[in-house]
Every structure is written in C-alpha cells, then in structure tokens.
Amino acid sequence: MEDFVRQCFNPMIVELAEKAMKEYGEDPKIETNKFAAICTHLEVCFMYSDFHFIDERGESIIVESGDPNALLKHRFEIIEGRDRTMAWTVVNSICNTTGVEKPKFLPDLYDYKENRFIEIGVTRREVHIYYLEKANKIKSEKTHIHIFSFTGEEMATKADYTLDEESRARIKTRLFTIRQEMASRGLWDSFVSPREAKRQLKKDLKLQEPCAGSPTKVSHRTSPALKTLEPMWMDSNRTAALRASFLKCPKK
C-alpha cells in the first residue's frame, strides 16, 4: 500500500500526509491504510478548491487556464494539511474577520462566497452513515458537510453541493480511479476492512522476517516528496502544481 500511495499521489500531497501523521505520532510505513486515506482526503480538498475564484463583484467564477486576474481571490481557504497551530490561527483569523461562529473541531475548508466552514468526508462505506457520524461529532449547523464515496455517491447538508456538477464529477472520477487501481493491485479489500488490513499487516511482517542463514536485504528507497517544498497555502497560486493533472497510477 505504501508503494501505491507514493506512486499514485502527487509528491506534495504525500509529504503533507506524512507530516500530518508524524504530528500525531503515527508511522506511514506501518499504518499504510491511514496513509492512503489521508492522501485521498487531502487530494479531494485540493480538488474541491481548485479553479474556483471570486471576482471583484463577489461572484464565484471558474478559471481553469491562463494567468488569473489580479483582482481574483481564491473562493476556498484550505485548512486541511496545515499543522494544528497554524490551522487554528487561520480559523481564528477567519472568524474575527467574518464574524462566523468558531467551530469546535478543525474544518477542512472555508468558503468565502457562502461564508461557511466546510467539512469534507471521503468514505468507503454508505455515505448517509458517514454523514450522520460527521454531523453527530461536529454538532454544529454552521459547518457545512459534504461527503463523497468511492462509488460515486455524495451527500451534503440540505442537499447543497456547493460546487458545480462538473467540478464534483472530477472528484468522483478520481475516487473511482483510485478504487480501481487499488483493486487491480489486490489492496482494496484490506483498505475497506480493518480486520482484513490487520491480517494483511501480520502477513507482511511475517514475510519481512529475515530467514536464518540468509542475508537481509535493506531498502534505501528515497521518498519522492520534495525536500524543499514550501507550504502550499503560502503560495498565491497554491494549487497550480496540482492543476495540470493528478498523477495517474502507473500499471505494473
């Protein structure tokens, strides 16, 4: 699964996911399913924000190519992917500036057009079940919830899907592609089932045990993540590197 993640996600997303896991004391090399889930969630958040701007009249517009007009601002503020301290700083700044209610939990995005925080969910289960779990945890009518599944289903607060149909279709297509690529590598079942994941982990660890009298092979594979990557939110064109195309999973 770790190799799949590093091959199939943009290196910037991989690095952000690694940092997020290490912040909570988690190891991407061990908790590989969580690693894949975090990368998927990050990518959906970036795709949700990508191409969407607000013009000088306050109208939401989509700009897919060319140099964006200087008067345009990003419609969405990306909160997911930042370290907790910086994320709360951004949330507090937004609340102080707009007067919106401060959320109890860190949201994923802020929509400057609708003036609301957004919680993005990506689930391997039934969308309505995951939606209810999110709503029960957040316990706030102010935070908008939008859930996507790997089967193309989605569910949002009051059936308000925020984005246009084409933008949502891009996200659904990407999720379906990830599912298909996982399945072709025999990874999907363990990704969906925690029990199967534990069984696979035990199997992998057993296979990694050095045999008596056999030389131990040590892998020195270098992470493709950019070592000098600047945080994407510090760049005015923070999603430009992700726009052209998300890396397509190479076939074995």
Curated annotation (Swiss-Prot):
Main location: host cell
Subcellular location field: Host cytoplasm; Host nucleus
InterPro entries: PA/PA-X, PA/PA-X_sf
Gene3D superfamilies: Influenza RNA-dependent RNA polymerase subunit PA, endonuclease domain (3.40.91.90)
Site (Important for efficient shutoff activity and nuclear localization): 195, 198-199
Domain of life: Viruses
Protein's UniProt name: Protein PA-X
Species whose genome carries this gene: Influenza A virus (strain A/Gull/Maryland/704/1977 H13N6)
